[in-house]
Amino acid sequence: MSVKWTSVILLIQLSFCFSSGNCGKVLVWAAEYSHWMNIKTILDELIQRGHEVTVLASSASILFDPNNSSALKIEIYPTSLTKTELENFIMQQIKRWSDLPKDTFWLYFSQVQEIMSIFGDITRKFCKDVVSNKKFMKKVQESRFDVIFADAIFPCSELLAELFNIPFVYSLSFSPGYTFEKHSGGFIFPPSYVPVVMSELTDQMTFMERVKNMIYVLYFDFWFEIFDMKKWDQFYSEVLGRPTTLSETMGKADVWLIRNSWNFQFPYPLLPNVDFVGGLHCKPAKPLPKEMEDFVQSSGENGVVVFSLGSMVSNMTEERANVIASALAQIPQKVLWRFDGNKPDTLGLNTRLYKWIPQNDLLGHPKTRAFITHGGANGIYEAIYHGIPMVGIPLFADQPDNIAHMKARGAAVRVDFNTMSSTDLLNALKRVINDPSYKENVMKLSRIQHDQPVKPLDRAVFWIEFVMRHKGAKHLRVAAHDLTWFQYHSLDVIGFLLVCVATVIFIVTKCCLFCFWKFARKAKKGKND
């Protein structure tokens, strides 16, 4: 489309925006990697509808280039970290998480807590850099934004919302142990049938699995800290000039947009200010580049396999790469492998390596037979959207849980990255490609994903616009946020009722004893007479 026609369309959109009075100003607290990709999809749609979107990003941000022309307005605040330092730090922590042994529950989650705490320290530093920059804060405040939008896993947006007195909306995939969802959002997760995230359990639990799930619940509720909460609580209290906590401030969110859906997640109760918008980034496939299309077409009736371990995994040992390449070389399908490393010695003629692939477009291609994935939520939703069965090789975070969900739905097979042999991967591929049940099951999930009265992206945008129109959505916020923990669990009421029952029992007992004493005394007196 020419620049002329683009300008005309933009002018029409803006004219409609101003005439309807629905044009708003959205402030965004930046996220990184897949977290940003999900938010970016929503922001692009907001811009298409004529809203003004401004993103607050640090000078170290990996995904933002202030010189890159974009409809997004980027406000860069200075920080002492460099892009390279931040990227290296993130990659080091991800590798550390991926390499954690899962043999011991306590050791594994203690290490996860330490990693999350380090991430929290970096995020808190960025937050301090913003709120301590008086000139920058004044500039932002004078812009008079209507709403703040952010990923809840990167705190600070709620502090800005409190300082600027504007409503805010969260986007969130998950937090370890549902920490933020439960303690800040007031979400309800009955442990009898809702498995704790990262437990790799399903909603069909045996007695011993329910015992295991309860242990997870108790651990995450009373021991695990997603960040160093004391530091965050102290920081927020100092900035706001009154005692407060991170959880309390996050609990003031008007709407939570959870990047999940019921064809993926096991059912549990939802609050009025929570909506599921999983798969909002999914869209119909576009034509492939000619060279890639020619390779796909050369596969004939056998079709192709798409293989990607995501954007956050850039280093793989030569030994692991050769194990994988050897398995891929033995299947009749052609393979498109996203791999940014040295060419494996065992690479077959049927396999091509790419530093980047148009994953959504490949998954939507009619010749795609299977998807080898690390289990990232974005990739899984794209596979569901296009109806492609999966072989899961989870690495860290929620990925094992995601693959467990797909296994429970009969849409995936799992292999272990560190211990799998070429035969293991080969058998898994043959199973999902040759067993028609996997294709049937994932197509069922796909039909559910498509059969929605309102698309997830439209729902996400609706709620942000709703909050802007009504200057918040406090009428949807449950009163549980205003209760103490013992009031929430009705411990004060239970205690009062127990005292009442005990009092009644005491009085009745005393009355019975008194009556017994009176009758006994009368009987004794009559006997003496």
Curated annotation (Swiss-Prot):
| Amino acids binding UDP-alpha-D-glucuronate | 373-379, 398
- Reactions catalysed: glucuronate acceptor + UDP-alpha-D-glucuronate = acceptor beta-D-glucuronoside + UDP + H(+); 17alpha-estradiol + UDP-alpha-D-glucuronate = 17alpha-estradiol 17-O-(beta-D-glucuronate) + UDP + H(+); 17beta-estradiol + UDP-alpha-D-glucuronate = 17beta-estradiol 17-O-(beta-D-glucuronate) + UDP + H(+); 2-hydroxy-17beta-estradiol + UDP-alpha-D-glucuronate = 2-hydroxy-17beta-estradiol 3-O-(beta-D-glucuronate) + UDP + H(+)
**What intrachain disulfides are recorded?**
none
Which residues are glycosylated according to the annotation?
67-68, 315
* EC code(s) of this entry: 2.4.1.17
Q: Which InterPro entries match?
A: UDP-glycosyltransferase, UDP_glucos_trans, UDP_glycos_trans_CS
What's an example of a GO molecular-function annotation for this chain? glucuronosyltransferase activity
Q: Where are the transmembrane segments?
A: 493-509
Q: What is the effect of changing residue 398 to A/N?
A: Reduced androsterone, hyodeoxycholic acid and tetrachlorocatechol glucuronosyltransferase activities
Signal peptide feature range: 1-23
Q: Which GO terms describe its cellular component?
A: endoplasmic reticulum membrane; membrane
Q: Where in the cell is it found?
A: Endoplasmic reticulum membrane
Tell me a GO biological process for this protein.
estrogen metabolic process
Q: Please report the record's description of how this protein sits within the membrane.
A: Single-pass membrane protein
Keyword terms of this UniProt record: Endoplasmic reticulum, Glycoprotein, Glycosyltransferase, Lipid metabolism, Membrane, Signal, Steroid metabolism, Transferase, Transmembrane, Transmembrane helix
The job of this chain, per UniProt, is described as: UDP-glucuronosyltransferase (UGT) that catalyzes phase II biotransformation reactions in which lipophilic substrates are conjugated with glucuronic acid to increase the metabolite's water solubility, thereby facilitating excretion into either the urine or bile. Essential for the elimination and detoxification of drugs, xenobiotics and endogenous compounds. Catalyzes the glucuronidation of endogenous steroid hormones such as androgens (epitestosterone, androsterone) and estrogens (estradiol, epiestradiol, estriol, catechol estrogens).
Q: Which family does it belong to?
A: Belongs to the UDP-glycosyltransferase family.
What is the recorded name of this protein? UDP-glucuronosyltransferase 2B7
Which gene is this protein's source? UGT2B7
